[in-house]
Swiss-Prot record:
Domain MSP span(s) in chain numbering: 2-109
Protein name per its UniProtKB record: Sperm-specific class P protein 10
PANTHER family noted in UniProt: MAJOR SPERM PROTEIN, MSP DOMAIN-CONTAINING PROTEIN-RELATED
Gene designation per UniProt: ssp-10
Pfam families assigned: Motile_Sperm
InterPro entries per the UniProt record, alphabetical: Ig-like_fold (IPR013783), MSP_dom (IPR000535), PapD-like_sf (IPR008962), Sperm-specific_class_P (IPR051774)
Signal peptide annotation: none
Organism listed in the record: Caenorhabditis elegans
Tissue: Expressed at higher level in testis.
Length: 109
């Protein structure tokens, strides 16, 4: 089971902007994920919870509001998805994360 992010890093203007990243499931089983941010004041992530089908991908949009330039990160926790799961947020609470992917985020002046 593997999950990768493409592109692997995010650079946005400190004045605000957005970046789209693709989570790619390189494995043969469905993955469930949850995204955590080191800065919830200036970044918005959509979706925070979700599924990625086997050999599939899911787009994640990172949006930054205006603020001081600084370095932050997203950490994507993932695990095999329960077979009967339809609500990612509810199902994630019942799984033990199997790994993480970190996306460094840089806000530039």
């Amino acid at each position: 089971m593997s999950l990768t992010a493409d592109p692997p890093a995010c650079t946005v203007p400190a004045a605000g902007g957005s970046s789209t990243h693709k989570l790619v499931n390189g494995g043969a089983e469905k993955i469930i994920f949850k995204i955590k941010s080191s800065n919830n004041n200036e970044y918005r992530i959509a979706p925070v919870f979700g599924f990625v089908d086997p050999s599939g991908s899911k787009d994640v949009v990172i949006t930054r509001t205006a603020g001081a330039p600084k370095e932050d990160k997203l950490v994507i926790h993932f695990a095999p998805a329960p077979a009967d799961a339809t609500d990612a947020q509810a199902a994630f609470a019942a799984v033990t994360p199997a790994g993480t992917v970190t996306i460094p985020m840089s806000a530039t002046a």
